[in-house]
Curated annotation (Swiss-Prot):
Gene3D superfamilies: MetI-like (1.10.3720.10), Osmoprotection protein (prox), domain 2 (3.40.190.120), Periplasmic binding protein-like II (3.40.190.10). The lineage of its organism: Bacteria, Bacillati, Bacillota, Bacilli, Bacillales. Disruption phenotype: Deletion in strain LO28 significantly increases sensitivity to physiological concentrations of human bile, in vitro. Accumulation of abnormally high levels of bile salts, such as chenodeoxycholic acid (CDC), in the cytoplasm, when strain LO28 is cultured in the presence of bile. Attenuates systemic infection following oral inoculation of BALB/c strain mice with bacterial strain LO28. No obvious growth defect in strain LO28 in culture when exposed to osmotic or chill stress. InterPro entries: ABC_Gly_betaine_transp_sub-bd, ABC_transp_perm/SBD, MetI-like, MetI-like_sf. Keywords: Membrane, Stress response, Transmembrane, Transmembrane helix, Transport, Virulence. It is found in: Membrane. It comes from Listeria monocytogenes serovar 1/2a (strain ATCC BAA-679 / EGD-e). This is Probable ergothioneine transporter EgtUBC. GO terms for biological process: glycine betaine transport; SOS response. Part of an ABC transporter complex EgtU required for the uptake of ergothioneine (EGT), a natural low-molecular weight (LMW) thiol antioxidant. Responsible for the translocation of the substrate across the membrane. Also contains a C-terminal periplasmic solute-binding domain (SBD) which binds to EGT with sub-micromolar affinity. Does not bind glycine betaine, carnitine, choline, proline, or cholate. Plays a role in bile acid tolerance. Dispensable for choline uptake. Probably not involved in betaine, carnitine or choline mediated osmo- or chill tolerance. PANTHER family: GLYCINE BETAINE/L-PROLINE TRANSPORT SYSTEM PERMEASE PROTEIN PROW, OSMOPROTECTANT IMPORT PERMEASE PROTEIN OSMW.
Amino acid sequence: MNTLIDTFTVRKDELFTALVQHIQISFVSLFIAVLIALPLGIYLTRHKRLAEPIIQVAAIFQTIPSLALLGLLIPLVGIGIVPAIIALVIYALLPILRNTYTGIKEVDPALVEASRAMGMNKWKRLYKVQLPLAMPVIMAGIRTAMVLIIGTATLAALIGAGGLGDLILLGIDRNDNSLILLGAIPAALLAILFDFLLRFLEKASFKSTIITISAGILLTAAIIVVPYFASDKKEITIAGKLGAEPEILINMYKLVIEDETDLKVNVKPNMGKTSFVFNALKSGDIDIYPEFTGTVLETFLKENAKTHDPEEVYTQARDGLAKDFDMTYLKPMKYNNTYALAVSPEFAKENNLEKISDLGPVSDQVKAGFTLEFKDRSDGYKGIQDKYGLTFSNLKTMEPKLRYNAIKSGDINLLDAYSTDSELAQYKLKVLEDDQQLFPPYQGAPLMLTKTLDKYPELKKPLNKLAGKITDDEMRKMNYEVNVNGKSAYTVAKDYLKDQGIIK
């Protein structure tokens, strides 16, 4: 409890910002869903043949996994708040649509006939009789949708939309339960609060409900429109993948750019995995992010490294990006954050493990825990199978940070890692030598669209100040400061740049 209170004290400003973002996303999504589902539900009560097929389509949409839906939306609308809202609206449609249709359909036919006998036309019957009587059922659907939206909105953090999911993802990444709770508890309380408010609205008069919904529509429009008029034309956005290391790097980029130019830099840490961030760059939703040479070849260019020489691998990656994607890849830093296989110290000692080839005789004892990306890469597990002839029958896939918890608890004894991971030292893991030279060099460098550099040519000089800087050991220590000692990535980045004389 004390740790949670301490975390709250340190991060209360971040919590407030995330809470406001979460409410904005949830509020906008709910009202757009109501604007779509309520009229559609009314329409279906008058066209009953279409009702079941359309409601079934809404049900099918709700079964699409949220991560898959976000992944499909990114190439179409980019990253940020727009795809998050679209996804949340899709998930919220079913309960509102079904309850609107059911609520109106179950109004006592005798009352409808009585209103017809009094000379009311179909619109008056709807407004004066059917909707007021159906409103409790409709509001129950809206309440269900609201709770669903607030819970699912935590995933918006994966695509840079912000919200309480930022704190939850950061907690998972840092293995910090207090951070996870700092995001999860407000999300739960928010769901309870909104449910209470909507329950109160459910008991209000029909006229009051309509006025409230109308006010909500105007507020929604304001939330969507105002930020566009307030945007800063001289602002650039630098994003990073999940993890402490990308967050340190993007803060370095921010600091060197703002030190030498008049550009304002907005950073978006922990945006998501490789495909999310790269697609965001392609669509122009972000301007720069740090990418690694080996990832460029394997994931984007679908090429094997022609050599293991770092300079030649960088040149191959740089030229391929320029040709295939019209992107500029600036000079890389010194450290090589390549893949590695690491085992628990006990397993290494028991079996005298020094290099990857040593796993052959004990492969039946291996309990491997790999990331999904590593398992699917030709320079990952597929390469291990091809080049080393190793297949692990007991293999689980999991999120990057969960692997270290799993090896600590003994659930696994082998994992994939990056050579600069602070956890290698934290958990005293044994890194196995890549004796067959499977893993290519992975040097990080700023990646951007060529048109971005054409627009802001002043970016090149400050960013190239990081070229050839940061050794493996320095990066590992910086990661340790963030992941283990709890320092902010911004502070660690600033301290390094000042120590090196790169900024004043």
